C-alpha cells in the first residue's frame, strides 16, 4: 500500500504539470512527517498545503499504518527516501549542498 501511495503521489505531481524536481522537497517533507509518527510535525506540514479535514484524517490513517511496523520503517523507509531525494534530477535542481543539508536534517529528525 505504501508503494501505491508513493506512485500515486508521483503521478498526481506529473499530472498537475509540476516538474517532479520542484516537488522533490515538499513531497519528502510530507513523507518524512508521516514516517516520523509525530502528529505535530504532520499537522505542520499539512498546514503549508492548506489541507482539508478529510486529507488530514487520511494522512493520520497512513501515519498509523507506518507506526504499526515502527522498527522496519525506522530502518528501511529513510533509506528509500534518501535514495529518492538524492536522485540525479533532485540533485541537479537543488544542488548537492542543499540536498546534503536536507538529508542531515531528516536523519536528525528520524533519530539516525
Swiss-Prot record:
Compartments in which it is found: Secreted
Database matches in CDD domains: Secretoglobin
This protein's record includes keyword Glycoprotein: yes
SUPFAM superfamilies given in the database record: Uteroglobin-like (SSF48201)
Tissues of expression: Expressed in lacrimal gland, at higher level in males than females. Expressed in the submandibular gland.
UniProt keyword annotations, A-Z: Allergen, Glycoprotein, Secreted, Signal
Glycosylation sites: 50
Cellular component aspect of the GO annotation: extracellular space
Gene3D superfamilies: 1.20.920.50
Database matches in PROSITE patterns: SCGB
Signal peptide: 1-23
Family from the record: Belongs to the secretoglobin family.
Name of this chain's protein: Secretoglobin family 2B member 20
Amino acid at each position: 500500500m505504501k508503494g501505491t501511495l508513493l506512485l500515486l503521489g508521483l503521478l498526481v505531481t506529473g499530472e498537475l504539470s509540476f516538474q517532479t524536481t520542484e516537488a522533490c522537497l515538499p513531497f519528502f517533507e510530507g513523507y518524512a512527517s508521516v514516517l516520523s509518527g509525530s502528529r505535530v510535525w504532520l499537522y505542520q506540514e499539512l498546514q503549508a498545503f492548506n489541507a482539508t479535514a478529510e486529507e488530514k484524517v487520511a494522512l493520520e490513517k497512513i501515519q498509523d499504518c507506518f507506526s504499526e511496523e515502527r522498527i522496519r520503517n525506522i530502518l528501511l523507509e529513510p533509506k528509500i527516501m534518501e535514495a529518492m531525494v538524492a536522485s540525479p534530477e533532485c540533485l541537479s535542481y537543488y544542488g548537492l549542498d542543499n540536498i546534503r543539508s536536507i538529508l542531515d536534517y531528516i536523519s536528525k529528525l528520524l533519530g539516525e
